[in-house]
């Protein structure tokens, strides 16, 4: 379970607030949210290992995992803008499963090894039931709302400011029922051949070549049903004539029959604030029965399908060659290169006159849109290990890696919301992010002192993906023709994803120390202490577009045109990468002992490393 307290603010105009040098924002709403979740996880595995002759073996792995989640989400919102109290509860059943099968073999012959494998993975995520009901209480505030909007957020709901004690004043406002199914199937096959060579102690190693094919098929199907239940309460009374009615207005459905009598009061946010709490909850079984009886009242909402559904596939073909060359006992050189080719094809929906929210029961024109893209990269890697002393080694590495776009951004959609003048546009033309990585690591080991490692790293990343919102303007990068849109949409807003033209860099220093206290007496003997400290500095050019207006030259009052022209103001600012820390510290304490000849370790550690160093042999 978890709980959140959220306050929303708003600010308009540029007139400074009295006594301040700026326009002070005001509260529009405060929200209490409590999420309860019950999880059941099941796992099963079946593995086989066959030896079919000298130097040959075949292995089979089968793994099934299932997860069911029963979710209960409660939210209470103090809506200052509209002067009402809103209580929303969502009851959901989410199920997921993964089935993985893999067959692989290794065969030794002629001082070489041939490895092969085939695999299949089937991942399914479905929400067969998600029911949401919203109750409202009108005019619960007992003081001037304007005065509440400037208070500290947790004081808005103080008993002297709002009267919510009579829950019979709640009335049923609306209901939503959602289902969703997402599937992802992956098929893969790979083949590797490794040939060792040995020219004595001065020069030995191996050469390895291989290839891989991977196919991914994805699909998401959603269904949303919604209805205003205050306006359509007579339909509910036809199905449930004895259901209780609201004391606020006898025409509306009340809350009394939905109350959970077994609800147990729990402190909200550990009683951090006196005025924040949930005093009741809806009964989940009653909510399910309500939908089962009144499912004919709910109406399908097409907007959700247009904005979320997709299908598609990706085909990845890769090949590589690498080698490990040991020059004496002091130098190990590991060069390699990988060729990566990806072809993708996705389908989604595009619509015109799409409603601006998912509560309007409107029909509109839409079509299925398909788009494809392909890209290929050569990804080199070089590793060098130098060991001048038995207890000292130096490691250098250069690698290039890819990070592919989120497939939800690749689904080709053109959503035109004419009522608010907005367009949402997605296509498969996004490039993967390419990272060039440099690492240098020095390690020193002494049995009496322990292991000391210091490393430096530098990363340069291009093709970061960001979302831009701008006006559609002719003769600019957001010319409607560039998106296949009609010129009549000039002046409308558009939101689309694109690759950033600015690179990001990350550089840092990492120090790691591990030592064992061998000379301490008793249980403390052999205690292992470790510490890791990372200092990082990152820099990214962020591209921001501000939608603005300028006065139209030669404007004539009454000529039927608008007095202002829309413009896009582009700004680039540099800052550290989002969610990228500048300092990390990890500590580890281990107490290895031996019980009956079995080594037992009880580590206690904190901190999570945010960086993965290049793998060095």
Model regions and ranges:
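Transmembrane beta-strands of outer-membrane beta-barrel proteins
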Residues: 1, 58-60, 112-118, 205-211, ...
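Transmembrane beta-barrel wall of Gram-negative outer-membrane proteins
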Residues: 1-73, 93-103, 110
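Transmembrane beta-strands of outer-membrane beta-barrel pores
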Residues: 2-4, 64-68, 109, 120-124, ...
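Flexible glycine-rich, low-complexity coil/linker segments exposed to the extracellular/periplasmic environment
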Residues: 3-5, 10-27, 143-174, 225, ...
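Signature of Gram-negative outer-membrane beta-barrel scaffolds
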Residues: 31-36, 67-69, 174-176, 192, ...
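Short loop/turn motifs that connect adjacent beta-strands in outer-membrane beta-barrel proteins
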Residues: 54-55, 110-113, 149-154, 197-207, ...
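Outer-membrane beta-barrel signature, preferentially recognizing the C-terminal barrel domain
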Residues: 87-104, 308-315, 373, 402-461, ...
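Gram-negative outer-membrane beta-barrel transporters
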Residues: 458-460, 477-610
């Amino acid at each position: 379970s978890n709980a959140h307290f959220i306050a929303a603010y708003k600010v308009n105009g540029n007139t400074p607030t009295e006594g301040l040098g700026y326009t002070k924002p005001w509260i529009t709403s405060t929200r209490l949210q409590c999420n309860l979740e019950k999880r059941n996880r099941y796992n099963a595995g079946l593995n086989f290992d066959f030896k079919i002759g000298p130097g040959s073996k075949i292995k089979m792995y089968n793994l099934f995992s299932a997860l069911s989640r029963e979710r209960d989400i409660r939210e209470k919102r103090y809506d200052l803008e509209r002067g009402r109290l809103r209580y929303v509860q969502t009851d959901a059943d989410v199920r997921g499963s993964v089935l993985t099968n893999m067959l692989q073999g290794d065969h030794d012959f002629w001082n070489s090894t041939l490895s092969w494998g085939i695999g299949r993975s089937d991942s399914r995520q479905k929400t067969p039931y998600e029911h949401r009901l919203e109750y409202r209480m009108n005019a619960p505030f007992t003081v001037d709302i304007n005065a509440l909007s400037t208070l500290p957020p947790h004081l808005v709901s103080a008993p002297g400011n709002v009267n919510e004690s009579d829950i019979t004043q709640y009335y049923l406002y609306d209901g939503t029922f959602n289902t969703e199914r997402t599937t992802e199937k992956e098929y893969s096959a790979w083949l590797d051949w490794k040939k060792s060579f040995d020219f004595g102690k001065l020069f030995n190693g191996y050469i390895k070549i291989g290839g891989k094919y991977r196919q991914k098929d994805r699909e998401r199907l959603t269904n949303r049903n919604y209805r205003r239940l205050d306006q359509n309460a007579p339909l509910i009374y036809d199905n449930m004539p004895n259901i209780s009615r609201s004391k606020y207005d006898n025409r509306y459905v009340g809350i009394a029959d939905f109350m959970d009598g077994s609800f147990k009061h729990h402190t909200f946010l550990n009683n951090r604030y006196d005025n924040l709490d949930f005093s009741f909850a809806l009964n989940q079984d009653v909510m399910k029965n309500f939908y089962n009886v009144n499912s004919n009242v709910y109406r399908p909402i097409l907007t959700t399908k247009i904005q979320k559904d997709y299908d598609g596939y990706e085909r990845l073909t890769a090949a590589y060659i690498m080698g490990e060359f040991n020059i004496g006992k002091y130098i190990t050189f590991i060069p390699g290169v990988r060729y990566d080719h990806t072809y993708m094809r996705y389908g989604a929906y595009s619509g015109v006159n799409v409603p601006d929210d998912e509560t309007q029961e409107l029909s509109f024109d839409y079509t299925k849109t398909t788009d494809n893209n392909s890209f290929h990269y050569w990804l080199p890697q070089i590793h060098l290990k130098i060991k001048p002393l038995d207890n000292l080694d130096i490691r250098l590495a250069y690698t290039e890696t890819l990070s592919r776009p989120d497939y939800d951004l690749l689904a080709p959609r053109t959503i035109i919301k004419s009522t608010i003048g907005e367009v949402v546009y997605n296509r498969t033309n996004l490039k993967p992010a390419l990272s060039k990585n440099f690492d240098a690591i020095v390690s020193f080991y002494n049995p009496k002192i322990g292991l000391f490692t210091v490393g430096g790293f530098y990363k340069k990343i291009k093709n970061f993906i960001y979302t831009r919102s701008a006006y559609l303007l002719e003769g600019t990068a957001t010319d409607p023709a560039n998106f296949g849109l009609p010129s009549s949409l000039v002046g409308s807003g558009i939101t689309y994803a694109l690759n950033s033209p600015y690179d990001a860099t990350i550089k840092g220093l990492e120090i790691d120390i591990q030592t064992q206290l061998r000379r301490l007496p008793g249980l403390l003997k052999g205690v292992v202490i470790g510490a890791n400290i990372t200092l990082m500095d990152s820099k990214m050019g962020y591209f921001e577009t501000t939608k603005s207006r300028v006065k139209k030259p030669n404007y004539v009052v009454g000529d039927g045109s608008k007095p202002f022209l829309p413009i896009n103001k582009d700004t680039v600012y540099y800052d550290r990468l989002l969610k990228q820390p500048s300092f990390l510290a990890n500590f580890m304490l281990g107490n290895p002992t031996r019980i009956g000849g079995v080594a037992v370790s009880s580590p206690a550690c904190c901190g999570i490393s945010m960086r993965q160093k290049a793998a060095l042999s």
